[in-house]
Amino acid sequence: MKESGTFFLVVGPSGAGKDSLIDGARATLGNDEYVFARRIITRPSGSPGEDHESVAEAEFAERERNGEFLVTWHAHGLRYGLPQWLVGLLETGKHVVANGSRGVIAMLARQLPRFVVVNVTAPQDVLAQRIAARGRESGDDVMRRVARQAPPMPDGVHCVTVTNDSTLDLGVARFTDALRNGANAGSVPQPASRRHLAAKLDGQPLDEGAYEAILRDAIAGRYTAQELTAFLTAATRSLDDREVVALARARTRFTARIEWDEPIVVDKHSMGGIPGSRITLIVVPIVAAYGLAMPKTSSRAITSAAGTADAMETVARVDLTHDDVRRCVAQARACIAWNGRLNHSVIDDVMNAITRPLGLDSRRWAVASILSKKATAGATHVIVDIPYGPQTKLSARADADALAGLFEEVGKGLGLHVRALVTDGSRPIGRGVGPALEVRDVRQVLENHPDAPMDLREKALRFAGEIIAFDPRVASAAQGMRIATALLDEGSARAAFDRIVATQGIRPDPVAPGAHTHVIVAPAEGRVAAINGWQISGIARAAGAPRSAGAGIDLLCTIGERVAAGEPLYRIHAESAADLATAVAMTGPAGEASTAVRVDPD
C-alpha cells in the first residue's frame, strides 16, 4: 500500500508573502509529487490576489451542507474553503500544499495522519513596508495590523518556520526547502534524536553526534515548536564550552565548505549594538589593499538603523552569487556582500523563530552559529568585535571578556584562527546613524577628509592592523596597524574601495541623506553627559532607516563637549515629511527618546 502524502498548511501574518512563496514553489515543485490547492472563496473572480475558485455565498453554503469541504473558515468578511477531494490525493501519496488559517490548524491536525504547518514570518518592519506598499491602508492601520498577535500553535503539531525577509528568490528557496524537508515529518512521531533532546532537558551535556541528530530532525520538522522551545531554553541554561564546539562542528555538516586557493582567507564579525561603527567598509579595503583575501558577507539590520549590507547597498550591489564573490576576490581581493543569498542557514530559520520572540539569551548558541558559517564560507582567520556598554548586548566587561575567550576556543575546535577584541560600546562610533549617513562617514575616512570622525578611523585602523598581523610576515599587531595607517594615508585603501564597488556593480544613483530634516538643540547650557545609542537608533528607525536608506541621525556633538542653550545636538534626516514627523515626536518631553542626548549643567 502506498504511503500517505503530507498535507502542508501555509500560515503567516499579512505581508509575510505567502502567496508569492506558494507561486514560486508551484513553479519549482509543481509535478506529480506536490499538488498546490486552489481555495474556494466567496470573492468575485478576477479580484486582486491569488487564483481561486469564486462562488456565491449561497453556493458555498450548499457545498458545505453537502460535505464537499475538508475545512472552512471566515476571514475579512469572506468565506474560505478547501475541497474534500484533497484527501484522496493524500491517499495516493501526493503532498498537498494549501494556504490556510491558524484557526483551522487543530481541526486539520485531528483529521490528517501526516500534517505539517509551514509558518511564514518576517520582521515587523518588513511586514509594515510590504503592507504599506499595497496602498490600501494608512500608516496607523498598517501598524495595528502588524502588531496583531497570532494565536499560539496547538500542542503536538509539527511546525516548520520560513523567514521571508529578503529577496523573492531566497524566500522561495527557503520555502521549497521546508516542503522538501517536511514531506516525511508526519511519519516520524518519535524522532531518532528524541533521547538526546531528553538528555539536554535534564541538563546533560551532548556530543557532536547528538547535536547533529537533533538539528537534522528539527530541520525535517519532526519536533513541535514546544519541544524545540524547551530544548533551546535548556541549551541556554547549560551549554558548556565543549558543547559549543560540538554544536559548531555539527552545524558545519549541513553546508558544503567553500574552498579558496588562498593561504589566508579573512573574515570579520561584530556582535553589534553600537550606532554607526561602520568600520567594515573601511577595514575591508585596507586589507584588500594589503593583499589578503577578504570575501566579507554581512547582514542587514534587524533591530538597528543599518546593517553593513544596508550601508554598502547605497553605493554598490550586494546581492552577490557565489560566482560573483569569487570574481570580486580575484579582481579586487575582497567584497562586501549580503549574506542572505550566500550562507543562508535552514537551522537558523528554525531556531531564530523561537529564540527571538522569547528573548532567550542565546549568545553561546550564537558563537556556534557564527563560527560554523565562517568555517563553511572557507575562512581561515576571523576577527570578532565584542562591544560592551550600557546599551549593547553585553553590559559588563567581564561578560565581554568571557565571550571573547569562548570565540577563540571554539575557533580552535573548528581549525580557525580567531582573534576576538573587546571594545568600548558606551557611545556611538562616527557621526552618522543610518545607511547613507554612515557611508558618508566612511568616505570621509577613506579620503582622509579633515572632518572625518576620528573615533571611526581609529577603530577601523585597529581592526585592520590586527587582521594584517595574521600574515606571518608581520611581527605584531602594532606593525600591522602601521601598515594599515600607511595604506589609508596614501590613498591605497580608497582606491581598493573603489575597485570593490566597481567589481560588485556600482550603483548609478548613490543614496544621499534624506532631504527632510529637523535639528534637536540643547535645552540648556551644559556638557553632553551621555548619548543613548538605543534611543538614537530608535529615532533613526522611526525616520525610516534602514528601509529608507537616506534616513537617520547626524550627531552634531560628542560626549564631554560643552554646549550652549539652543546649540544643535543632532539632526534627523528622513525621506518623507510623515517619517520625519514620526521621528520628531519621539524626541519630545513625553517621547520614547526624550533623553537620547543628555546635557547636564556644569
UniProtKB/Swiss-Prot annotation:
HAMAP family: PhnN, Thymid_phosp_2. The keyword Ribonucleoprotein does not apply. This is Bifunctional ribose 1,5-bisphosphokinase-thymidine phosphorylase. Pathway: Metabolic intermediate biosynthesis; 5-phospho-alpha-D-ribose 1-diphosphate biosynthesis; 5-phospho-alpha-D-ribose 1-diphosphate from D-ribose 5-phosphate (route II): step 3/3. It is an enzyme of class 2 (transferase). One of its GO terms (molecular function) is ATP binding. The keyword Glycosyltransferase applies. Keywords: Alkylphosphonate uptake, ATP-binding, Glycosyltransferase, Multifunctional enzyme, Nucleotide-binding, Transferase. GO terms for cellular component: cytosol. Residues 188-602 are annotated as: Thymidinephosphorylase. It catalyses: alpha-D-ribose 1,5-bisphosphate + ATP = 5-phospho-alpha-D-ribose 1-diphosphate + ADP; thymidine + phosphate = 2-deoxy-alpha-D-ribose 1-phosphate + thymine. Its EC number is 2.7.4.23, 2.4.2.4. Catalyzes the phosphorylation of ribose 1,5-bisphosphate to 5-phospho-D-ribosyl alpha-1-diphosphate (PRPP).
